[in-house]
Amino acid sequence: MRRLTAPLVAAWLGLSGVALASLAVVTPAEAQQAGGWRKEVADKAKAAQEAGQAGNYKEAIRLLQEAKAKGPLQPAEEQGVNELLIWAASGAKDYRLLAATIEERLATGRVRGNDQIQKLNVLAGTYYTLGDLRKTVSTTEQLIKARGGTGTADDLILLGQAQFQLKNYQAAAATLEQAYPAARRAGKSQAIQVKLLETLNAAYFELKNDQKRLETLHQLMVIQPKTSVFDQLVSQYQRTSANDPVAMINLYRLGARTNVLAKDHFAKYADVALDVSSPGEAARMLERGMASGAIARDDRNQRLLADAKQQLEALKKGLDQQEREARAIPAGEQDARLALTFYTLGNYAKAAEAAKRALEKGRLNRPDDVHMLLGVALMELKRGKEAIPSFEAAEKANPKVAGVAEVWRDVAGG
Protein backbone atom coordinates (compact mmCIF):
# COMPACT_ATOMS: atom_id res chain seq x y z
CA MET A 1 0.00 0.00 0.00
CA ARG A 2 1.18 3.49 -0.75
CA ARG A 3 2.66 5.52 2.07
CA LEU A 4 0.25 8.01 3.58
CA THR A 5 1.38 11.53 4.29
CA ALA A 6 0.02 14.39 6.35
CA PRO A 7 -0.84 17.82 4.98
CA LEU A 8 1.17 20.83 6.10
CA VAL A 9 -0.34 22.47 9.15
CA ALA A 10 0.79 25.94 8.09
CA ALA A 11 -1.97 25.90 5.52
CA TRP A 12 -4.52 25.39 8.27
CA LEU A 13 -3.28 27.89 10.83
CA GLY A 14 -1.73 30.56 8.65
CA LEU A 15 1.53 30.12 10.51
CA SER A 16 3.53 31.94 7.88
CA GLY A 17 2.15 35.10 9.45
CA VAL A 18 2.17 33.99 13.05
CA ALA A 19 5.00 36.33 14.00
CA LEU A 20 2.84 39.30 13.09
CA ALA A 21 0.37 38.57 15.88
CA SER A 22 -0.34 41.55 18.13
CA LEU A 23 1.64 41.56 21.32
CA ALA A 24 1.29 44.01 24.17
CA VAL A 25 4.16 46.47 23.77
CA VAL A 26 5.23 48.60 26.72
CA THR A 27 6.39 51.95 25.35
CA PRO A 28 9.38 53.83 26.80
CA ALA A 29 7.10 56.59 28.06
CA GLU A 30 4.89 54.12 29.93
CA ALA A 31 7.90 52.33 31.35
CA GLN A 32 9.60 55.54 32.48
CA GLN A 33 6.48 56.55 34.35
CA ALA A 34 6.85 53.33 36.31
CA GLY A 35 10.46 54.27 37.10
CA GLY A 36 13.69 52.29 36.87
CA TRP A 37 14.93 53.53 33.48
CA ARG A 38 18.27 55.05 32.67
CA LYS A 39 18.10 57.98 30.26
CA GLU A 40 20.48 56.46 27.70
CA VAL A 41 18.42 53.27 27.55
CA ALA A 42 15.13 55.18 27.32
CA ASP A 43 16.50 57.38 24.52
CA LYS A 44 17.53 54.34 22.46
CA ALA A 45 14.15 52.72 23.05
CA LYS A 46 12.29 55.86 22.02
CA ALA A 47 14.36 56.20 18.84
CA ALA A 48 13.78 52.51 18.08
CA GLN A 49 10.04 52.93 18.48
CA GLU A 50 10.02 55.89 16.10
CA ALA A 51 12.08 53.93 13.54
CA GLY A 52 9.70 50.98 13.75
CA GLN A 53 6.64 53.19 13.39
CA ALA A 54 8.22 54.55 10.22
CA GLY A 55 8.59 50.97 8.94
CA ASN A 56 12.35 50.75 9.49
CA TYR A 57 12.36 47.66 11.69
CA LYS A 58 16.00 46.83 11.04
CA GLU A 59 17.04 50.20 12.44
CA ALA A 60 14.73 49.67 15.39
CA ILE A 61 16.39 46.33 16.08
CA ARG A 62 19.87 47.88 15.87
CA LEU A 63 18.95 50.61 18.37
CA LEU A 64 17.35 48.17 20.79
CA GLN A 65 20.37 45.89 20.68
CA GLU A 66 22.53 48.92 21.50
CA ALA A 67 20.22 49.65 24.42
CA LYS A 68 20.68 46.10 25.68
CA ALA A 69 24.45 46.55 25.43
CA LYS A 70 24.33 49.33 28.03
CA GLY A 71 24.85 46.80 30.76
CA PRO A 72 22.48 44.64 32.76
CA LEU A 73 18.96 45.98 32.34
CA GLN A 74 16.73 46.70 35.29
CA PRO A 75 13.38 44.82 35.27
CA ALA A 76 11.49 47.82 33.88
CA GLU A 77 14.15 48.37 31.23
CA GLU A 78 14.21 44.69 30.28
CA GLN A 79 10.46 44.62 29.89
CA GLY A 80 10.26 47.78 27.79
CA VAL A 81 13.26 47.04 25.55
CA ASN A 82 12.40 43.39 24.94
CA GLU A 83 8.72 44.11 24.27
CA LEU A 84 9.82 46.62 21.65
CA LEU A 85 12.31 44.11 20.27
CA ILE A 86 9.55 41.49 19.95
CA TRP A 87 7.48 44.04 18.05
CA ALA A 88 10.39 45.02 15.78
CA ALA A 89 11.43 41.40 15.13
CA SER A 90 7.83 40.63 14.15
CA GLY A 91 7.77 43.55 11.74
CA ALA A 92 11.11 42.52 10.23
CA LYS A 93 10.01 38.87 10.05
CA ASP A 94 13.20 37.96 11.89
CA TYR A 95 11.75 34.84 13.44
CA ARG A 96 14.93 33.65 15.12
CA LEU A 97 15.29 36.96 16.94
CA LEU A 98 11.60 36.91 17.75
CA ALA A 99 11.85 33.45 19.32
CA ALA A 100 15.01 34.29 21.24
CA THR A 101 13.51 37.50 22.64
CA ILE A 102 10.26 35.85 23.71
CA GLU A 103 12.31 33.11 25.39
CA GLU A 104 14.33 35.78 27.19
CA ARG A 105 11.16 37.48 28.40
CA LEU A 106 9.62 34.23 29.62
CA ALA A 107 12.84 33.26 31.40
CA THR A 108 12.56 36.30 33.69
CA GLY A 109 9.56 34.73 35.43
CA ARG A 110 7.81 38.09 35.24
CA VAL A 111 5.50 37.16 32.34
CA ARG A 112 2.23 35.78 33.67
CA GLY A 113 -1.42 35.27 32.89
CA ASN A 114 -2.75 36.14 29.46
CA ASP A 115 0.54 37.75 28.47
CA GLN A 116 2.34 34.45 29.08
CA ILE A 117 -0.30 32.53 27.10
CA GLN A 118 -0.08 34.99 24.22
CA LYS A 119 3.70 34.82 24.09
CA LEU A 120 3.78 31.01 24.26
CA ASN A 121 1.20 30.90 21.47
CA VAL A 122 3.33 33.09 19.20
CA LEU A 123 6.50 31.24 20.21
CA ALA A 124 5.06 27.82 19.35
CA GLY A 125 3.97 29.03 15.91
CA THR A 126 7.29 30.74 15.35
CA TYR A 127 9.21 27.55 16.08
CA TYR A 128 7.00 25.70 13.61
CA THR A 129 7.70 28.38 11.00
CA LEU A 130 11.42 27.91 11.67
CA GLY A 131 11.07 24.14 11.28
CA ASP A 132 12.13 23.42 14.86
CA LEU A 133 9.61 20.67 15.53
CA ARG A 134 10.92 19.59 18.92
CA LYS A 135 10.65 23.12 20.29
CA THR A 136 7.24 23.42 18.65
CA VAL A 137 6.10 20.40 20.65
CA SER A 138 7.64 21.45 23.96
CA THR A 139 6.38 25.04 23.66
CA THR A 140 2.87 23.96 22.69
CA GLU A 141 2.81 21.61 25.67
CA GLN A 142 3.83 24.55 27.89
CA LEU A 143 1.08 26.62 26.28
CA ILE A 144 -1.57 23.99 27.00
CA LYS A 145 -0.36 23.75 30.59
CA ALA A 146 -0.55 27.54 30.92
CA ARG A 147 -4.15 27.41 29.69
CA GLY A 148 -4.98 25.10 32.59
CA GLY A 149 -4.39 21.81 30.79
CA THR A 150 -6.98 22.18 28.03
CA GLY A 151 -5.64 23.19 24.64
CA THR A 152 -7.59 25.07 22.00
CA ALA A 153 -8.29 23.51 18.62
CA ASP A 154 -5.34 25.41 17.15
CA ASP A 155 -3.03 24.24 19.95
CA LEU A 156 -3.97 20.62 19.36
CA ILE A 157 -3.72 20.86 15.58
CA LEU A 158 -0.23 22.35 15.81
CA LEU A 159 0.92 19.86 18.43
CA GLY A 160 -0.46 16.85 16.56
CA GLN A 161 1.09 17.92 13.27
CA ALA A 162 4.50 18.52 14.82
CA GLN A 163 4.36 15.14 16.57
CA PHE A 164 3.43 13.48 13.28
CA GLN A 165 6.31 15.12 11.43
CA LEU A 166 8.65 13.95 14.18
CA LYS A 167 7.31 10.42 13.47
CA ASN A 168 5.94 10.14 16.99
CA TYR A 169 2.82 8.55 15.57
CA GLN A 170 1.43 7.29 18.87
CA ALA A 171 1.51 10.76 20.41
CA ALA A 172 0.23 12.34 17.20
CA ALA A 173 -2.75 9.99 17.07
CA ALA A 174 -3.65 10.69 20.69
CA THR A 175 -3.44 14.45 20.12
CA LEU A 176 -5.34 14.44 16.83
CA GLU A 177 -8.13 12.34 18.38
CA GLN A 178 -8.67 15.38 20.62
CA ALA A 179 -8.02 17.92 17.88
CA TYR A 180 -10.79 16.73 15.55
CA PRO A 181 -13.73 17.18 17.96
CA ALA A 182 -12.15 20.41 19.21
CA ALA A 183 -12.01 21.69 15.62
CA ARG A 184 -15.68 20.81 15.11
CA ARG A 185 -16.69 22.60 18.32
CA ALA A 186 -14.64 25.62 17.28
CA GLY A 187 -16.42 25.78 13.92
CA LYS A 188 -13.31 25.09 11.87
CA SER A 189 -13.90 24.73 8.15
CA GLN A 190 -14.67 21.39 6.56
CA ALA A 191 -11.30 21.55 4.79
CA ILE A 192 -9.47 21.73 8.13
CA GLN A 193 -11.55 18.90 9.59
CA VAL A 194 -10.77 16.73 6.55
CA LYS A 195 -7.04 17.43 6.79
CA LEU A 196 -7.09 16.56 10.47
CA LEU A 197 -8.71 13.21 9.76
CA GLU A 198 -6.34 12.55 6.86
CA THR A 199 -3.37 13.11 9.17
CA LEU A 200 -4.95 10.90 11.82
CA ASN A 201 -5.51 8.20 9.20
CA ALA A 202 -1.86 8.48 8.17
CA ALA A 203 -0.76 8.11 11.81
CA TYR A 204 -2.84 4.96 12.26
CA PHE A 205 -1.45 3.63 8.98
CA GLU A 206 2.08 4.00 10.35
CA LEU A 207 0.98 2.34 13.62
CA LYS A 208 -0.64 -0.51 11.64
CA ASN A 209 -3.84 0.04 13.61
CA ASP A 210 -6.40 -1.09 11.05
CA GLN A 211 -9.42 -0.77 13.32
CA LYS A 212 -8.73 2.89 14.14
CA ARG A 213 -7.90 3.56 10.48
CA LEU A 214 -11.29 2.23 9.44
CA GLU A 215 -13.04 4.38 12.03
CA THR A 216 -11.20 7.41 10.68
CA LEU A 217 -11.95 6.53 7.06
CA HIS A 218 -15.63 6.19 7.97
CA GLN A 219 -15.57 9.71 9.41
CA LEU A 220 -13.97 10.99 6.22
CA MET A 221 -16.68 9.34 4.13
CA VAL A 222 -19.27 11.18 6.21
CA ILE A 223 -17.85 14.69 6.04
CA GLN A 224 -16.20 14.68 2.60
CA PRO A 225 -16.21 11.49 0.49
CA LYS A 226 -13.15 11.20 -1.74
CA THR A 227 -11.97 8.57 -4.19
CA SER A 228 -8.68 8.24 -2.30
CA VAL A 229 -10.57 7.51 0.93
CA PHE A 230 -13.00 5.10 -0.71
CA ASP A 231 -10.16 3.23 -2.42
CA GLN A 232 -8.59 2.59 0.99
CA LEU A 233 -11.91 1.26 2.28
CA VAL A 234 -12.17 -1.09 -0.69
CA SER A 235 -8.67 -2.44 -0.01
CA GLN A 236 -9.43 -2.96 3.67
CA TYR A 237 -12.82 -4.63 3.21
CA GLN A 238 -11.68 -6.86 0.37
CA ARG A 239 -9.28 -8.33 2.90
CA THR A 240 -11.41 -8.35 6.05
CA SER A 241 -14.52 -9.73 4.30
CA ALA A 242 -12.54 -12.18 2.14
CA ASN A 243 -14.22 -10.53 -0.88
CA ASP A 244 -17.67 -11.46 0.41
CA PRO A 245 -20.08 -10.51 -2.41
CA VAL A 246 -22.69 -8.98 -0.09
CA ALA A 247 -20.08 -6.83 1.62
CA MET A 248 -18.45 -5.74 -1.63
CA ILE A 249 -21.57 -4.93 -3.63
CA ASN A 250 -22.88 -2.78 -0.80
CA LEU A 251 -19.55 -1.02 -0.55
CA TYR A 252 -19.56 -0.33 -4.29
CA ARG A 253 -23.15 0.90 -3.97
CA LEU A 254 -21.92 3.47 -1.48
CA GLY A 255 -19.08 4.52 -3.78
CA ALA A 256 -21.48 4.94 -6.69
CA ARG A 257 -23.96 6.89 -4.59
CA THR A 258 -21.27 9.32 -3.41
CA ASN A 259 -19.54 9.50 -6.83
CA VAL A 260 -16.16 8.34 -5.54
CA LEU A 261 -15.60 5.14 -7.51
CA ALA A 262 -12.06 4.78 -8.82
CA LYS A 263 -11.56 3.69 -12.44
CA ASP A 264 -11.05 0.03 -11.58
CA HIS A 265 -14.14 -0.03 -9.36
CA PHE A 266 -16.66 0.23 -12.22
CA ALA A 267 -15.72 -3.16 -13.68
CA LYS A 268 -15.43 -4.75 -10.23
CA TYR A 269 -18.86 -3.44 -9.28
CA ALA A 270 -20.32 -4.80 -12.52
CA ASP A 271 -18.73 -8.22 -11.94
CA VAL A 272 -20.02 -8.60 -8.40
CA ALA A 273 -23.46 -7.32 -9.46
CA LEU A 274 -23.67 -10.10 -12.05
CA ASP A 275 -22.48 -12.60 -9.43
CA VAL A 276 -25.37 -11.70 -7.10
CA SER A 277 -27.95 -11.58 -9.95
CA SER A 278 -28.35 -7.81 -10.17
CA PRO A 279 -28.01 -7.20 -13.93
CA GLY A 280 -29.46 -3.69 -13.76
CA GLU A 281 -26.64 -2.54 -11.52
CA ALA A 282 -24.12 -4.30 -13.75
CA ALA A 283 -25.48 -2.59 -16.87
CA ARG A 284 -25.47 0.83 -15.21
CA MET A 285 -21.87 0.44 -14.07
CA LEU A 286 -20.68 -0.84 -17.44
CA GLU A 287 -22.33 2.09 -19.20
CA ARG A 288 -20.96 4.63 -16.72
CA GLY A 289 -17.52 3.07 -16.91
CA MET A 290 -17.49 3.15 -20.72
CA ALA A 291 -18.75 6.73 -20.79
CA SER A 292 -15.99 7.86 -18.41
CA GLY A 293 -13.23 5.83 -20.08
CA ALA A 294 -12.80 3.63 -17.01
CA ILE A 295 -13.96 0.55 -18.96
CA ALA A 296 -12.75 -0.21 -22.46
CA ARG A 297 -15.38 -0.43 -25.20
CA ASP A 298 -13.96 -3.75 -26.39
CA ASP A 299 -15.83 -6.84 -27.58
CA ARG A 300 -15.73 -8.56 -24.20
CA ASN A 301 -17.24 -5.63 -22.31
CA GLN A 302 -19.82 -5.02 -25.03
CA ARG A 303 -20.89 -8.67 -24.70
CA LEU A 304 -21.10 -8.32 -20.91
CA LEU A 305 -23.28 -5.24 -21.30
CA ALA A 306 -25.54 -6.94 -23.83
CA ASP A 307 -25.86 -9.98 -21.57
CA ALA A 308 -26.71 -7.81 -18.54
CA LYS A 309 -29.41 -5.99 -20.52
CA GLN A 310 -30.81 -9.29 -21.75
CA GLN A 311 -31.03 -10.58 -18.17
CA LEU A 312 -32.69 -7.33 -17.16
CA GLU A 313 -35.37 -7.69 -19.84
CA ALA A 314 -36.05 -11.25 -18.68
CA LEU A 315 -36.55 -10.00 -15.12
CA LYS A 316 -39.01 -7.36 -16.30
CA LYS A 317 -41.07 -9.94 -18.21
CA GLY A 318 -41.27 -12.31 -15.27
CA LEU A 319 -41.76 -9.66 -12.58
CA ASP A 320 -45.52 -10.05 -12.07
CA GLN A 321 -45.27 -13.81 -11.71
CA GLN A 322 -42.25 -13.51 -9.40
CA GLU A 323 -44.18 -11.11 -7.16
CA ARG A 324 -47.27 -13.35 -7.00
CA GLU A 325 -45.17 -16.38 -6.08
CA ALA A 326 -43.15 -14.50 -3.47
CA ARG A 327 -46.27 -13.20 -1.72
CA ALA A 328 -47.80 -16.69 -1.66
CA ILE A 329 -44.80 -18.44 -0.08
CA PRO A 330 -44.60 -18.29 3.76
CA ALA A 331 -40.78 -18.23 3.87
CA GLY A 332 -38.98 -14.97 3.16
CA GLU A 333 -36.34 -16.05 0.65
CA GLN A 334 -38.53 -15.43 -2.42
CA ASP A 335 -39.39 -11.93 -1.17
CA ALA A 336 -35.66 -11.32 -0.67
CA ARG A 337 -35.05 -12.21 -4.33
CA LEU A 338 -37.99 -10.03 -5.35
CA ALA A 339 -36.51 -7.13 -3.38
CA LEU A 340 -33.27 -7.49 -5.35
CA THR A 341 -35.22 -7.59 -8.62
CA PHE A 342 -37.00 -4.35 -7.79
CA TYR A 343 -33.70 -2.81 -6.68
CA THR A 344 -31.87 -3.74 -9.87
CA LEU A 345 -34.80 -2.28 -11.87
CA GLY A 346 -34.45 0.97 -9.93
CA ASN A 347 -37.80 0.68 -8.11
CA TYR A 348 -36.49 1.40 -4.62
CA ALA A 349 -39.88 1.81 -2.94
CA LYS A 350 -40.99 -1.66 -4.06
CA ALA A 351 -37.56 -3.06 -3.14
CA ALA A 352 -37.97 -1.73 0.40
CA GLU A 353 -41.48 -3.20 0.71
CA ALA A 354 -40.35 -6.64 -0.47
CA ALA A 355 -37.29 -6.59 1.82
CA LYS A 356 -39.49 -5.77 4.82
CA ARG A 357 -41.81 -8.68 4.00
CA ALA A 358 -38.82 -11.00 3.65
CA LEU A 359 -37.52 -10.02 7.08
CA GLU A 360 -40.96 -10.39 8.65
CA LYS A 361 -41.37 -13.91 7.20
CA GLY A 362 -37.83 -14.96 8.11
CA ARG A 363 -36.11 -18.23 7.12
CA LEU A 364 -33.54 -16.34 5.02
CA ASN A 365 -30.21 -17.62 3.69
CA ARG A 366 -28.48 -14.25 4.28
CA PRO A 367 -30.49 -11.98 6.62
CA ASP A 368 -27.59 -9.52 6.52
CA ASP A 369 -28.02 -9.20 2.75
CA VAL A 370 -31.71 -8.31 3.11
CA HIS A 371 -31.06 -5.84 5.93
CA MET A 372 -28.42 -4.14 3.77
CA LEU A 373 -30.68 -4.04 0.72
CA LEU A 374 -33.49 -2.51 2.78
CA GLY A 375 -31.15 0.12 4.22
CA VAL A 376 -29.66 1.06 0.85
CA ALA A 377 -33.12 1.22 -0.78
CA LEU A 378 -34.28 3.57 2.00
CA MET A 379 -31.19 5.71 1.44
CA GLU A 380 -32.08 5.96 -2.26
CA LEU A 381 -35.54 7.12 -1.15
CA LYS A 382 -33.87 9.81 1.01
CA ARG A 383 -35.08 8.15 4.21
CA GLY A 384 -31.69 7.92 5.88
CA LYS A 385 -32.87 7.95 9.50
CA GLU A 386 -35.18 5.00 8.78
CA ALA A 387 -32.26 3.15 7.19
CA ILE A 388 -30.05 3.23 10.29
CA PRO A 389 -31.74 0.29 12.13
CA SER A 390 -31.38 -1.86 9.00
CA PHE A 391 -27.64 -1.21 8.82
CA GLU A 392 -27.30 -1.88 12.55
CA ALA A 393 -29.15 -5.20 12.13
CA ALA A 394 -26.86 -6.19 9.23
CA GLU A 395 -23.83 -5.28 11.33
CA LYS A 396 -24.97 -7.67 14.07
CA ALA A 397 -26.06 -10.42 11.67
CA ASN A 398 -22.73 -11.14 9.97
CA PRO A 399 -19.19 -10.05 10.88
CA LYS A 400 -18.19 -10.16 7.20
CA VAL A 401 -20.46 -7.23 6.37
CA ALA A 402 -20.20 -5.47 9.75
CA GLY A 403 -17.70 -2.85 8.62
CA VAL A 404 -19.55 -2.01 5.42
CA ALA A 405 -22.83 -1.81 7.34
CA GLU A 406 -21.16 0.49 9.85
CA VAL A 407 -19.94 2.97 7.24
CA TRP A 408 -23.40 3.03 5.64
CA ARG A 409 -24.88 3.66 9.09
CA ASP A 410 -22.43 6.50 9.69
CA VAL A 411 -23.27 8.07 6.33
CA ALA A 412 -27.00 7.69 7.01
CA GLY A 413 -26.61 9.37 10.39
CA GLY A 414 -24.26 12.07 9.14
Model-derived features: where do they sit?
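N-terminal leader/linker segments that initiate helical-solenoid repeat arrays
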Residues: 2-8, 20-104, 108-118, 407
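Solenoid-like repeat scaffolds
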Residues: 32-37, 68-74, 104-113, 141-149, ...
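Generic helix N-cap/helix-start motif at coil->alpha-helix transitions
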Residues: 37-46, 75-82, 112-122, 148-158, ...
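Residue at a conserved register position within TPR or TPR-like alpha-solenoid repeats
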Residues: 51, 89, 127, 163, ...
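Structural motif corresponding to the intra-repeat A-B loop/turn of tetratricopeptide repeats
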Residues: 54, 92, 130, 166, ...
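C-terminal soluble interaction/assembly domains
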Residues: 331-414
